[in-house]
Amino acid sequence: MPKVRTKDLIEQFQLELISGEEGIHRPIDTSDLSRPGIEMAGFFTYYPADRVQLLGKTELTFFDTLTSDQKQERMKALCTEETPCIIVTRNQDVPDELLQASRESGMPLLRSSQTTTRLSSRLTNYLEGKLAPTTAVHGVLVDIYGVGVLITGQSGVGKSETALELVKRGHRLVADDSVEIRQEDEDMLVGSSPDLIEHLLEIRGLGIINVMTLFGAGAVRNYKRITLVINLEIWDQKKNYDRLGLDEEKMKIIDTELTKITLPVRPGRNLAVIIEVAAMNFRLKRMGVNAAQQFSERLMSAIELGNQE
């Protein structure tokens, strides 16, 4: 099912529908836009018919210089069955040839009061957000000191309970149980909650609680960029866990690699505090302060001095 249709653009940007009402359910599959200037000159070899077409002052001024036959020919070629729509900007008058071609092909012809550049920028941002690659991950997403932390792990390991403790400590819940993730840009993942379970947290033995109702609007967020993954797992005595912090794991979601930290879970460990510190330490590393690396360098210096003596 298409994520975006022409009617969505009409509603989102308050566009005026001139003709082609029967085509407003046409799908839009790309965020790229087209300003068919070279096509106005008659070159349709590489015409991107599947894109939203924008006709600004430049295109329509050139169009006025064409002969009557050329005008009809160019507009018929522009209005194809796969073209989502043509938008005339700046509230300019719609050429009769374009109106006729739109009616014959059933392609939506729209008009906007905005400038071409302004509308193009807004359309691109909207379409990139809607058409971005998406996936869903089982886990909890929390905003901790401005760091979007995705907490993962097997069912029953204590993800929701840890999230509840983090919320009580002043951090903000984004999503529990199912995190919808979309890649809005290269190396940029944004997580949010499905509408059905937004602001809800499930605690075994307690049931479902509404975090916003209990703790206020400051305890929740609608979406957050994900920069750190913390995986909770039951403590395995046979497994060697990182004790210095020099080894950095990675986890790939869609096309983006994120820093991953594995935290072993056992009675007596305050996971909320550990995750808080992990988020703060992650911020420090991004600022160029790496405590583990500094310790390693001091240790190597001490060893070298000891060998010299």
Curated annotation (Swiss-Prot):
InterPro entries: HPr(Ser)_kin/Pase (IPR003755), Hpr_kin/Pase_C (IPR011104), Hpr_kin/Pase_Hpr_N (IPR011126), P-loop_NTPase (IPR027417), Ser_kin/Pase_Hpr-like_N_sf (IPR028979). GO terms for biological process: regulation of carbohydrate metabolic process. Its cofactor is Mg(2+). ATP binds at G153, Q154, S155, G156, V157, G158, K159, S160. The active site is at H138, K159, D177, R243. Keywords: ATP-binding, Carbohydrate metabolism, Kinase, Magnesium, Metal-binding, Multifunctional enzyme, Nucleotide-binding, Serine/threonine-protein kinase, Transferase. Residues 201-210 are annotated as: Important for the catalytic mechanism of both phosphorylation and dephosphorylation. Belongs to the HPrK/P family. The Walker A ATP-binding motif also binds Pi and PPi. Catalyzes the ATP- as well as the pyrophosphate-dependent phosphorylation of a specific serine residue in HPr, a phosphocarrier protein of the phosphoenolpyruvate-dependent sugar phosphotransferase system (PTS). HprK/P also catalyzes the pyrophosphate-producing, inorganic phosphate-dependent dephosphorylation (phosphorolysis) of seryl-phosphorylated HPr (P-Ser-HPr). Both phosphorylation and phosphorolysis are carried out by the same active site and suggest a common mechanism for both reactions. NCBIfam families: hpr-ser (TIGR00679). This is HPr kinase/phosphorylase. It comes from Bacillus anthracis.
